[in-house]
């Protein structure tokens, strides 16, 4: 059951033998006094949230067995969040039927290993038998010695409460415990057999510890503990309370405290103490603050917040998102060398559900000579995923703890603040400017046109590096590029088509700029580019450029109607740019700057056509405007 359901509704089902007082218990709760005349069975009772201690709407269902079949009972029980098995402390038979009838029936409903909490309710503890024969004071016919073995043998039984509908003893407590059993269940957290935290509880709490360990030293200092306390509960701990916590941990867990700070083992032990002392709500308050549902999985709304991206818009990291991921790099770059080693990278993403940056997709990013991720490559990764896979960005930021601290105590928040939706491209064109930071360049070319070498050059990798890359690698490469002294991110995306007749997807045709690569030594290479251009990009507003590769080889005539230079002139494209050996491995190559320039200023396509390709990297934005104005004047003469 999700947290949303828990907070909205708790469904309590009462079962047990006839005459145990199930209906009387509900009537006493409703009337706040003993009711002599009770109906045979009550319909569903709804208790509003504002009259319950946990502020949850609660429904109580009284199931009678006299006239109902087991199948019907099972169907009703399956809708329950918690089941109260009522027996009479004045009748041994009703106790025996707990194991003979009721617990097996519950397992039929939920399965052999279920997590629906069960509460045993011993009614009629006021000391009457059949409402006539008085029992000795303080003595019940059913002793705890009969109930304890049942609880020990059935771990789904949360607790046992003796009560009396007649004297009102523990009546309200029963339903309070039932609510708590749903909202703060024990079984996901605690293994009754080993008397230890469950593996999934440990995993969740380890994530919490790592997020709260701001300096990544493996300890929670007093400052970090107090920040944790204020984050989860809204109030700080006094210095005395802090010392009491550390003393309690040190007494029971010798490895839990070191250098006057709480270690991971101590943090886990502290929550074990909470649970053993019946303070499950404390641990659950922490877990829910960090996004966990009752299943100890992160909530869907926490991982994947709803967002609408209008057509023509894209997504980028917001300033808050940039600050958060940048701080993570600083936190986990233990040797402060400006790179993340494999162990540092693994440590950073250890709280995520799956490996994030693998050997394959690291080829899309800038690394140092040892293959370690640089700060620039790390930031480029986040910009890439936010543009092409926003869901992945949301999920990873949630696991890394982005929303924590951005909402009130007890609330997990979401990752929406980590991103910004850019203005529609159409508006950018109309306004002759954009505030976008990330731009996508489609790389199109026939097989062996040199696309891999070209793309990997943006990440600073040369021929020897490319030679070690397998055939199956990331189709993306991203890096930071300067556009008139302003940093932008250029994302190259290879189009994997075997022939120009292959269809391109909408995501591919909506790029900011397109680079068509052709091998000057292959007579059939340019035809591929020309065909794709005419089929998908002619008469569009997407800037395009032809790039000649392997220019050191002997140039041959291309098997196309007209040469590449004439083709570009005919379709008003910039002259073909030569990608030579001097450009290989150079992330700061003017070619990448030109691609970024064309993506940032698509409204200046005419300038790109009129200007020499080398001139493009030299002109200022103002000069480009002048050139465009000059063209318009000439056109209108």
From Swiss-Prot:
The lineage of its organism: Eukaryota, Metazoa, Ecdysozoa, Nematoda, Chromadorea. Ca(2+) 2 binds at residues 333, 335, 337, 339, 344. Residues 1-613 are cytoplasmic. The chain crosses the membrane at residues 614-634. GO terms for molecular function: calcium ion binding; GTP binding; GTPase activity. Belongs to the mitochondrial Rho GTPase family. The gene is miro-1. Residues 7-184, 436-601 form the Miro domain. It is found in: Mitochondrion outer membrane. GTP 1 binds at residues 28-35, 74-78, 135-138. It is an enzyme of class 3 (hydrolase). This is Mitochondrial Rho GTPase 1. GO terms for cellular component: mitochondrial outer membrane. Residues 635-637 are mitochondrial intermembrane. Mitochondrial GTPase involved in mitochondrial trafficking. Probably involved in control of anterograde transport of mitochondria and their subcellular distribution. It is a single-pass type IV membrane protein. Pfam families: EF-hand_5 (PF13202), EF_assoc_1 (PF08355), EF_assoc_2 (PF08356), Ras (PF00071).
């Amino acid at each position: 059951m999700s947290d949303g359901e828990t907070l909205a509704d708790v469904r309590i089902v009462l079962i047990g033998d006839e005459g145990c007082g199930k209906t009387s218990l509900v009537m006493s709760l409703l009337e706040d006094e003993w009711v002599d005349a009770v109906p045979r069975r009550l319909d569903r009772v709804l208790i509003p949230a504002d009259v319950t201690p946990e502020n949850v709407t609660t429904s109580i269902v009284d199931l009678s067995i006299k006239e109902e079949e087991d199948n019907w009972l099972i169907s009703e029980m399956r809708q329950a969040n918690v089941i109260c098995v009522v027996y009479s402390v004045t009748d041994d038979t009703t106790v025996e039927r707990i194991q003979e009838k009721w617990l097996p029936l519950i397992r039929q409903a939920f399965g052999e290993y279920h997590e629906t909490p069960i509460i045993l309710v011993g009614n009629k503890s006021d000391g009457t038998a059949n409402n006539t024969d008085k029992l000795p004071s303080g003595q019940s016919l059913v002793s705890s010695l009969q109930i304890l073995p049942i609880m020990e043998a059935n771990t789904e039984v949360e607790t046992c409460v003796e009560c009396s509908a007649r004297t009102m003893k523990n009546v309200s407590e029963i339903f309070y415990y039932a609510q708590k059993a749903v909202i703060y269940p024990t079984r996901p957290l605690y293994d009754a057999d080993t008397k230890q935290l469950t593996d999934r509880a440990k995993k969740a709490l380890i994530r919490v510890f790592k997020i709260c360990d701001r300096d990544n030293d493996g300890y929670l200092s007093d400052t970090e503990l107090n920040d944790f306390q204020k984050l989860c509960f809204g109030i700080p701990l006094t210095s005395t309370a802090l010392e009491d916590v550390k003393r309690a941990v040190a007494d029971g867990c010798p490895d839990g405290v070191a250098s006057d700070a709480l270690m991971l083992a101590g943090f886990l032990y502290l929550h074990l103490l909470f649970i053993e002392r019946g303070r499950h709500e404390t641990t659950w308050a922490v877990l829910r603050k960090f996004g966990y549902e009752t299943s100890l999985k992160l909530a869907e709304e926490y991982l994947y917040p709803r967002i609408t991206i209008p057509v023509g818009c894209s997504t980028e990291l917001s300033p808050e998102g940039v600050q958060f991921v940048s701080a993570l790099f600083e936190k986990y770059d233990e040797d402060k060398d400006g790179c993340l080693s494999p162990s540092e990278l693994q440590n950073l993403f250890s709280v995520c559900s799956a490996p994030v940056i693998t050997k394959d997709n690291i080829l899309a990013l800038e690394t140092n000579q040892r293959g370690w991720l640089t700060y620039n490559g790390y930031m480029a990764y986040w910009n890439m995923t936010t543009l092409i896979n926003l869901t992945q960005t949301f999920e990873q930021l949630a696991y890394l703890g982005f929303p924590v601290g951005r909402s009130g105590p007890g609330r997990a928040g979401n990752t929406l603040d980590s991103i910004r939706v850019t203005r529609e491209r159409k508006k950018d064109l109309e306004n002759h400017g954009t505030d976008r930071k990330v731009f996508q360049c489609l790389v199109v070319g026939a097989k062996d046109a040199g696309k891999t070498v070209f793309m990997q050059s943006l990440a600073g990798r040369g021929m020897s590096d490319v030679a070690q890359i397998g055939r199956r690698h990331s189709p993306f490469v991203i890096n930071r590029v300067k556009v008139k002294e302003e940093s932008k991110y250029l994302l190259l995306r290879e189009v994997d088509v075997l022939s120009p007749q292959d269809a391109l997807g909408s995501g591919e045709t909506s790029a900011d700029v397109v680079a068509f690569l052709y091998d000057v030594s292959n007579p059939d290479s340019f035809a591929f580019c020309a065909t794709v251009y005419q089929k998908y990009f002619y008469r569009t507003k997407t800037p395009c450029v032809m790039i000649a590769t392997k220019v050191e080889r002997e140039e041959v005539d291309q098997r196309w109607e007209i040469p590449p230079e004439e083709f570009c002139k005919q379709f008003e494209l910039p002259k073909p740019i030569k990608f030579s050996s001097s450009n290989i491995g150079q992330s700061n190559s003017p070619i990448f700057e030109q691609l970024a320039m064309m993506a940032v200023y698509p409204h200046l396509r005419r300038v790109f056509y009129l200007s020499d390709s080398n001139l493009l990297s030299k002109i200022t934005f103002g000069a480009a405007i002048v050139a465009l104005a000059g063209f318009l004047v000439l056109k209108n003469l």
